[in-house]
């Protein structure tokens, strides 16, 4: 589960990571009151789970409460990479002397954790890693010992911190590790971690991804998911139906069974999209290896509820999940949705009970559904239909 910035900030504060005051607001008037409460210079920041907020105009400095009102009024309702801004965080301003980068993530390949740190923070980490890879220190963290003072010192030394600053950064890194470990996260990122003019080290912006498999051990997970839109409507609907769903910024909805197949589907749709107007995957949705007709129907309900989706590619290889079960789920979902189903579906079935699955869909003969043999051909057709829809040409799947 990805958290909003304000939720990450609250967890940081709970674990003693130094942060500035921040208040979440869902209306311009609430933002104005928040700015008054904080006092002085504030920054109004869009709360969305994608990068690039600043470039999109989603982060604005507000010297007065009236300007905080205006900033929130401009930001709320904004679309940033397919994500609608429903909330802003009004944050206390800071006099920044230096910006750093720090993150901890799960390193599955090496069965350990990886700490990444740089004295050049503030920019997107992908850009830093590409343009100045030598500026990004990477230090393996033993899961059994974590980040203690010795490990934190190793990290700041590798990153090239000056001695005086390093002594201030070390205790903050240890606190950030406590957030990662105690909250059972798979990613904690602070960008930037700043040194203020007063000499304080503060986590100015944070990103946290929590391990959903650990939800049962944490009483606060339900509140994080639902409080103030902790998940958007589609994510919440997927979570309630035990579907693995991640919203992306494309136009071709993806449903598959098994994470490996879905990941491959994302790649092949992206490649097909290059031939059809730059269409890209709209999501990752895995209904699971033992999916039922109900989970298939729930998955379709989620995808068809995304306004960014122009076509849907259902890619299933029948194993434990038989193709006829998937077909029945598609039929059931379309029956329930009725006239609300307006987006073409391209279905590729293979494996267990594929003949019966194709027969069910052929007899159903829905104008929005096309069954295509072969993953390449199906992905190409789904991208083609999304491209047609983008240019205002209504098209059924057939």
Curated annotation (Swiss-Prot):
Top-level taxon: Bacteria
Top-level enzyme category: ligase
Cofactors that this protein relies on: Mg(2+)
EC number annotated for this UniProt entry: 6.2.1.5
Family matches, as Pfam families: ATP-grasp_2, Ligase_CoA
Residue intervals of the ATP-grasp domain: 9-237
Residues annotated as binding Mg(2+): 191, 205
Catalytic activities: succinate + ATP + CoA = succinyl-CoA + ADP + phosphate; GTP + succinate + CoA = succinyl-CoA + GDP + phosphate
Description of how the protein assembles with itself and partners: Heterotetramer of two alpha and two beta subunits.
Family named by the database record: Belongs to the succinate/malate CoA ligase beta subunit family.
Name of protein: Succinate--CoA ligase [ADP-forming] subunit beta
């Amino acid at each position: 589960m990805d958290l909003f910035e304000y939720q990450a900030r609250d967890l940081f504060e709970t674990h003693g990571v130094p942060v500035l005051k921040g208040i979440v607001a869902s209306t311009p008037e609430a933002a104005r009151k928040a700015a008054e409460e904080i006092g002085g210079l504030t920054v109004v920041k869009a709360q969305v789970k994608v990068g690039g907020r600043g470039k999109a105009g989603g982060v604005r400095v507000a010297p007065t409460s009236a300007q905080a009102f205006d900033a929130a009024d401009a930001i709320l309702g904004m679309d940033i990479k397919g994500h609608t801004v429903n909330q802003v965080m009004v944050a206390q301003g800071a006099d920044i002397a230096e910006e750093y980068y720090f993150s901890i993530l799960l390193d599955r390949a090496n069965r350990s954790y990886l700490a990444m740190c740089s004295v050049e923070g503030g920019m997107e980490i992908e850009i830093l890693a590409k343009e100045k890879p030598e500026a990004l220190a990477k230090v393996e963290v033993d899961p059994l010992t974590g980040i203690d003072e010795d490990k934190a010192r190793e990290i700041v030394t590798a990153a090239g911190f000056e001695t005086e600053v390093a002594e201030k950064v070390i205790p903050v890194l240890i606190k950030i590790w406590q957030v990662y470990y105690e909250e059972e996260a798979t990613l904690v990122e602070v960008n930037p971690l700043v040194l203020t003019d007063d000499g304080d080290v503060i986590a100015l912006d944070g990103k946290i991804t929590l391990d959903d498999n650990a939800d049962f051990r944490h009483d606060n997970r339900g509140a994080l998911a639902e409080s103030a839109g902790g998940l958007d409507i589609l994510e919440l609907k997927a979570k309630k139906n035990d579907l693995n769903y991640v919203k992306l910024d494309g136009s071709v909805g993806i449903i598959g069974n098994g994470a490996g197949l879905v990941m491959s589907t994302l790649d092949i749709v992206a490649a097909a999209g290059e031939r059809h107007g730059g269409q890209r995957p709209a999501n990752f949705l895995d209904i699971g290896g033992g999916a039922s007709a109900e989970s298939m129907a729930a998955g379709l309900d989620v995808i068809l509820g995304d306004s960014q989706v122009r076509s849907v590619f259902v890619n299933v290889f029948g194993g434990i999940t038989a193709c006829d079960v998937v077909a029945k789920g598609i039929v059931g979902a379309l029956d329930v949705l009725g006239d609300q189903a307006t987006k073409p579906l391209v279905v590729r079935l293979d494996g267990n009970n594929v003949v019966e699955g194709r027969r069910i869909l052929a007899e159903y003969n829905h104008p929005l559904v096309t069954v295509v043999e072969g993953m390449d051909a199906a992905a190409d057709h789904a991208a083609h239909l999304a491209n047609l829809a983008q240019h205002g040409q209504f098209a059924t799947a057939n």
